[in-house]
Protein backbone atom coordinates (compact mmCIF):
# COMPACT_ATOMS: atom_id res chain seq x y z
CA UNK A 1 0.00 0.00 0.00
CA UNK A 2 1.44 3.34 -1.06
CA UNK A 3 1.38 6.11 1.53
CA UNK A 4 2.44 9.74 1.47
CA UNK A 5 1.96 12.06 4.41
CA UNK A 6 2.36 15.82 4.52
CA UNK A 7 1.31 18.16 7.32
CA UNK A 8 -0.59 21.12 6.04
CA UNK A 9 -1.51 24.69 6.83
CA UNK A 10 -4.90 26.43 6.07
CA UNK A 11 -6.91 29.51 5.34
CA UNK A 12 -10.49 29.65 4.23
CA UNK A 13 -11.37 30.75 0.71
CA UNK A 14 -14.63 30.92 -1.25
CA UNK A 15 -16.06 27.68 -2.53
CA UNK A 16 -16.60 27.43 -6.28
CA UNK A 17 -18.52 24.54 -7.72
CA UNK A 18 -17.70 23.00 -11.08
CA UNK A 19 -20.64 22.21 -13.31
CA UNK A 20 -20.52 20.50 -16.64
CA UNK A 21 -22.65 18.35 -18.84
CA UNK A 22 -23.28 14.90 -17.41
CA UNK A 23 -21.95 12.27 -19.80
CA UNK A 24 -19.60 9.32 -19.85
CA UNK A 25 -16.65 11.63 -19.27
CA UNK A 26 -18.17 13.41 -16.26
CA UNK A 27 -17.52 12.13 -12.74
CA UNK A 28 -20.25 13.08 -10.29
CA UNK A 29 -19.34 13.55 -6.63
CA UNK A 30 -21.34 14.07 -3.46
CA UNK A 31 -19.14 15.86 -0.93
CA UNK A 32 -19.08 17.89 2.24
CA UNK A 33 -18.43 21.57 1.65
CA UNK A 34 -15.12 22.05 3.45
CA UNK A 35 -12.52 21.00 2.76
CA UNK A 36 -13.81 18.21 0.51
CA UNK A 37 -15.75 20.00 -2.24
CA UNK A 38 -13.18 22.76 -2.36
CA UNK A 39 -10.37 20.24 -2.86
CA UNK A 40 -12.33 18.47 -5.59
CA UNK A 41 -13.19 21.62 -7.51
CA UNK A 42 -9.99 23.57 -7.15
CA UNK A 43 -7.32 20.87 -7.00
CA UNK A 44 -8.60 17.59 -8.39
CA UNK A 45 -10.64 18.97 -11.30
CA UNK A 46 -7.65 20.29 -13.31
CA UNK A 47 -5.78 17.01 -12.87
CA UNK A 48 -8.80 14.95 -13.92
CA UNK A 49 -9.35 17.26 -16.89
CA UNK A 50 -5.93 16.22 -18.19
CA UNK A 51 -7.07 12.61 -17.87
CA UNK A 52 -10.16 13.30 -19.98
CA UNK A 53 -12.74 13.73 -17.23
CA UNK A 54 -14.85 16.67 -16.08
CA UNK A 55 -16.37 16.67 -12.61
CA UNK A 56 -19.65 17.79 -11.12
CA UNK A 57 -19.72 18.28 -7.35
CA UNK A 58 -22.88 18.45 -5.24
CA UNK A 59 -22.54 19.52 -1.61
CA UNK A 60 -24.70 17.24 0.53
CA UNK A 61 -25.17 16.71 4.24
CA UNK A 62 -22.81 13.92 5.27
CA UNK A 63 -25.69 11.80 6.53
CA UNK A 64 -27.10 11.53 2.98
CA UNK A 65 -24.01 10.86 0.92
CA UNK A 66 -23.51 7.11 1.26
CA UNK A 67 -27.12 6.27 0.47
CA UNK A 68 -27.05 8.63 -2.52
CA UNK A 69 -24.01 6.88 -4.01
CA UNK A 70 -25.47 3.44 -3.26
CA UNK A 71 -28.63 4.45 -5.17
CA UNK A 72 -26.52 5.41 -8.17
CA UNK A 73 -27.19 9.14 -7.95
CA UNK A 74 -23.45 9.89 -7.87
CA UNK A 75 -20.32 8.07 -8.96
CA UNK A 76 -18.51 8.70 -5.68
CA UNK A 77 -18.53 10.59 -2.42
CA UNK A 78 -15.82 12.32 -0.45
CA UNK A 79 -16.47 13.09 3.20
CA UNK A 80 -15.72 10.16 5.52
CA UNK A 81 -13.06 8.04 7.15
CA UNK A 82 -12.99 4.24 7.05
CA UNK A 83 -14.44 3.58 10.55
CA UNK A 84 -17.53 5.60 9.63
CA UNK A 85 -17.88 3.79 6.31
CA UNK A 86 -17.52 0.43 8.06
CA UNK A 87 -20.27 1.42 10.49
CA UNK A 88 -22.51 2.46 7.60
CA UNK A 89 -21.80 -0.74 5.65
CA UNK A 90 -22.69 -2.91 8.65
CA UNK A 91 -26.16 -1.35 8.73
CA UNK A 92 -26.63 -1.02 4.96
CA UNK A 93 -26.10 -4.66 4.11
CA UNK A 94 -24.55 -6.10 0.99
CA UNK A 95 -26.78 -4.25 -1.47
CA UNK A 96 -26.05 -0.81 -0.05
CA UNK A 97 -22.41 -1.20 0.98
CA UNK A 98 -19.70 1.00 -0.51
CA UNK A 99 -15.95 0.60 -0.94
CA UNK A 100 -13.29 3.17 -0.12
CA UNK A 101 -10.77 3.36 -2.97
CA UNK A 102 -8.39 6.13 -1.92
CA UNK A 103 -7.53 8.02 1.24
CA UNK A 104 -6.66 11.66 0.72
CA UNK A 105 -6.52 13.83 3.82
CA UNK A 106 -6.87 13.81 7.59
CA UNK A 107 -8.72 16.40 9.65
CA UNK A 108 -7.28 16.90 13.10
CA UNK A 109 -9.69 16.78 15.98
CA UNK A 110 -9.07 19.66 18.37
CA UNK A 111 -10.48 21.09 21.58
CA UNK A 112 -11.77 24.60 20.85
CA UNK A 113 -12.58 27.32 23.38
CA UNK A 114 -15.88 29.16 23.08
CA UNK A 115 -13.98 32.26 24.23
CA UNK A 116 -10.64 32.60 22.38
CA UNK A 117 -9.47 34.93 25.15
CA UNK A 118 -9.86 32.20 27.77
CA UNK A 119 -8.42 28.86 26.69
CA UNK A 120 -7.78 27.46 30.17
CA UNK A 121 -9.96 24.47 31.01
CA UNK A 122 -11.18 24.87 34.60
CA UNK A 123 -12.80 22.35 36.91
CA UNK A 124 -16.54 22.49 36.30
CA UNK A 125 -16.36 23.58 32.67
CA UNK A 126 -18.71 22.07 30.09
CA UNK A 127 -17.49 20.27 26.97
CA UNK A 128 -19.48 19.36 23.85
CA UNK A 129 -18.53 16.42 21.65
CA UNK A 130 -20.07 14.71 18.63
CA UNK A 131 -22.86 12.16 19.07
CA UNK A 132 -22.02 9.54 16.39
CA UNK A 133 -20.45 6.35 17.68
CA UNK A 134 -17.61 6.27 15.12
CA UNK A 135 -16.22 9.58 16.39
CA UNK A 136 -17.10 9.56 20.09
CA UNK A 137 -14.15 7.34 21.01
CA UNK A 138 -11.82 9.66 19.12
CA UNK A 139 -13.11 12.67 21.08
CA UNK A 140 -12.76 10.84 24.39
CA UNK A 141 -9.23 9.71 23.55
CA UNK A 142 -8.29 13.31 22.75
CA UNK A 143 -9.47 14.35 26.21
CA UNK A 144 -7.77 11.37 27.86
CA UNK A 145 -4.45 11.89 26.06
CA UNK A 146 -4.42 15.50 27.25
CA UNK A 147 -5.16 14.70 30.89
CA UNK A 148 -8.80 15.76 31.08
CA UNK A 149 -10.07 12.19 31.45
CA UNK A 150 -8.34 9.52 33.49
CA UNK A 151 -10.36 6.60 32.14
CA UNK A 152 -12.88 5.46 29.53
CA UNK A 153 -15.17 2.67 30.72
CA UNK A 154 -14.31 -0.83 29.54
CA UNK A 155 -18.05 -1.31 29.02
CA UNK A 156 -17.74 0.82 25.90
CA UNK A 157 -15.78 -1.93 24.14
CA UNK A 158 -17.00 -5.24 22.75
CA UNK A 159 -15.13 -8.54 23.06
CA UNK A 160 -13.03 -7.69 19.99
CA UNK A 161 -11.94 -4.37 21.45
CA UNK A 162 -14.16 -2.24 19.24
CA UNK A 163 -15.77 0.89 20.67
CA UNK A 164 -19.41 -0.11 20.33
CA UNK A 165 -21.46 0.70 23.44
CA UNK A 166 -22.05 4.29 24.50
CA UNK A 167 -25.22 6.08 25.59
CA UNK A 168 -25.07 9.59 24.13
CA UNK A 169 -27.72 10.67 26.64
CA UNK A 170 -25.51 9.65 29.59
CA UNK A 171 -21.94 10.31 28.40
CA UNK A 172 -20.57 11.13 31.84
CA UNK A 173 -21.48 7.65 33.10
CA UNK A 174 -18.90 6.16 30.73
CA UNK A 175 -15.87 8.29 31.62
CA UNK A 176 -13.83 9.23 34.65
CA UNK A 177 -12.47 12.76 34.79
CA UNK A 178 -9.01 13.43 36.16
CA UNK A 179 -8.98 14.88 39.67
CA UNK A 180 -8.35 18.42 38.43
CA UNK A 181 -11.45 18.22 36.21
CA UNK A 182 -13.75 16.09 38.37
CA UNK A 183 -16.69 18.51 38.06
CA UNK A 184 -16.47 18.93 34.29
CA UNK A 185 -19.27 17.56 32.13
CA UNK A 186 -19.59 16.21 28.59
CA UNK A 187 -22.62 16.64 26.33
CA UNK A 188 -23.07 14.81 23.00
CA UNK A 189 -24.71 16.71 20.14
CA UNK A 190 -24.98 16.40 16.36
CA UNK A 191 -21.80 17.24 14.47
CA UNK A 192 -23.70 19.70 12.28
CA UNK A 193 -24.61 21.69 15.42
CA UNK A 194 -21.20 21.65 17.12
CA UNK A 195 -19.94 24.99 15.82
CA UNK A 196 -23.22 26.85 16.28
CA UNK A 197 -23.61 25.44 19.80
CA UNK A 198 -20.06 26.17 20.97
CA UNK A 199 -21.21 29.37 22.66
CA UNK A 200 -23.50 27.31 24.89
CA UNK A 201 -20.52 25.41 26.30
CA UNK A 202 -17.10 26.36 27.60
CA UNK A 203 -15.27 24.09 25.16
CA UNK A 204 -16.00 21.81 22.24
CA UNK A 205 -14.24 18.93 20.50
CA UNK A 206 -14.64 19.65 16.79
CA UNK A 207 -13.37 17.91 13.64
CA UNK A 208 -11.29 20.07 11.33
CA UNK A 209 -13.93 20.49 8.63
CA UNK A 210 -16.56 21.51 11.18
CA UNK A 211 -14.25 24.14 12.64
CA UNK A 212 -13.24 25.45 9.21
CA UNK A 213 -16.83 25.87 8.14
CA UNK A 214 -18.43 26.99 11.38
CA UNK A 215 -15.93 29.02 13.41
CA UNK A 216 -14.74 31.45 10.77
CA UNK A 217 -11.30 32.86 10.14
CA UNK A 218 -10.37 32.95 13.83
CA UNK A 219 -10.85 29.20 14.32
CA UNK A 220 -7.12 28.68 14.87
CA UNK A 221 -7.07 31.15 17.78
CA UNK A 222 -9.58 28.97 19.63
CA UNK A 223 -7.53 25.75 19.56
CA UNK A 224 -6.54 24.53 23.03
CA UNK A 225 -4.93 21.25 21.96
CA UNK A 226 -5.18 18.76 19.12
CA UNK A 227 -4.71 15.10 18.37
CA UNK A 228 -1.33 13.43 18.47
CA UNK A 229 -1.16 12.53 14.79
CA UNK A 230 0.69 9.25 14.28
CA UNK A 231 0.92 7.23 11.08
CA UNK A 232 -1.58 4.79 12.57
CA UNK A 233 -4.06 7.57 13.31
CA UNK A 234 -3.56 9.09 9.87
CA UNK A 235 -4.28 5.82 8.12
CA UNK A 236 -7.28 4.98 10.29
CA UNK A 237 -8.96 8.38 10.20
CA UNK A 238 -7.98 9.78 6.79
CA UNK A 239 -10.96 10.91 4.72
CA UNK A 240 -11.31 9.24 1.37
CA UNK A 241 -13.43 8.57 -1.69
CA UNK A 242 -16.03 5.79 -1.64
CA UNK A 243 -17.77 4.18 -4.62
CA UNK A 244 -20.07 1.26 -5.30
CA UNK A 245 -18.03 -1.99 -5.22
CA UNK A 246 -18.93 -2.74 -8.85
CA UNK A 247 -17.35 0.59 -9.87
CA UNK A 248 -14.13 0.15 -7.90
CA UNK A 249 -11.98 -0.70 -10.91
CA UNK A 250 -13.66 1.28 -13.67
CA UNK A 251 -11.83 4.05 -15.53
CA UNK A 252 -13.45 6.88 -13.59
CA UNK A 253 -12.41 5.41 -10.26
CA UNK A 254 -8.88 4.69 -11.44
CA UNK A 255 -8.58 8.30 -12.59
CA UNK A 256 -9.76 9.60 -9.21
CA UNK A 257 -7.22 7.48 -7.35
CA UNK A 258 -4.38 8.55 -9.64
CA UNK A 259 -5.36 12.22 -9.46
CA UNK A 260 -5.19 12.38 -5.68
CA UNK A 261 -1.56 11.23 -5.88
CA UNK A 262 -0.62 14.22 -8.04
CA UNK A 263 1.84 16.62 -6.43
CA UNK A 264 -0.37 19.54 -7.40
CA UNK A 265 -3.13 18.24 -5.16
CA UNK A 266 -0.89 17.90 -2.11
CA UNK A 267 0.65 21.33 -2.80
CA UNK A 268 -2.78 22.90 -3.12
CA UNK A 269 -3.93 21.50 0.22
CA UNK A 270 -0.69 22.58 1.86
CA UNK A 271 -1.12 26.17 0.70
CA UNK A 272 -4.87 26.43 1.23
CA UNK A 273 -5.85 24.70 4.47
CA UNK A 274 -4.81 25.16 8.06
CA UNK A 275 -3.10 23.12 10.68
CA UNK A 276 -6.30 21.17 11.13
CA UNK A 277 -5.75 19.39 7.78
CA UNK A 278 -3.08 16.84 6.85
CA UNK A 279 -2.51 15.45 3.34
CA UNK A 280 -2.40 11.66 3.48
CA UNK A 281 -2.53 9.49 0.36
CA UNK A 282 -3.26 5.78 0.26
CA UNK A 283 -4.16 3.89 -2.91
CA UNK A 284 -6.59 1.19 -1.76
CA UNK A 285 -6.86 -0.41 -5.19
CA UNK A 286 -3.37 -1.91 -4.94
Please report, for each region that a protein language model flagged, where it lies by residue.
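C-terminal motif of bacterial Sec signal peptides marking the signal peptidase cleavage site
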Residues: 15-19
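Short, well-ordered beta-strand elements
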Residues: 24-34, 53-58, 125-127
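Short, polar/charged alpha-helical segment
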Residues: 33-56, 64, 74
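Short helix-initiation/N-cap motifs at beta->coil->alpha
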Residues: 57-67, 159-196
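Ligand-binding "clamshell"
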Residues: 87-101, 114-117, 200, 214-229
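A conserved helix-loop-strand patch within extracytoplasmic ligand-binding domains
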Residues: 97-150, 266
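A bilobed periplasmic-binding-protein/Venus flytrap-type ligand-binding module shared by bacterial periplasmic
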Residues: 108-119, 236-255
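Periplasmic-binding protein-like
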Residues: 135-146, 259-281
Amino acid sequence: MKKHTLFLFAALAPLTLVSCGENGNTITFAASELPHAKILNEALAPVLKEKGFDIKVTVLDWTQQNAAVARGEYDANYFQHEPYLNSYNADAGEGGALKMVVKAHFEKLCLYASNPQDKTLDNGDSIEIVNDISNIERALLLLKDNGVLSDISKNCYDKDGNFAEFDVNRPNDFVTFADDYSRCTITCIKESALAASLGDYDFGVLPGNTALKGLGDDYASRIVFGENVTEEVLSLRANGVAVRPADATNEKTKAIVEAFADQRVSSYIQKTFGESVVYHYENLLK
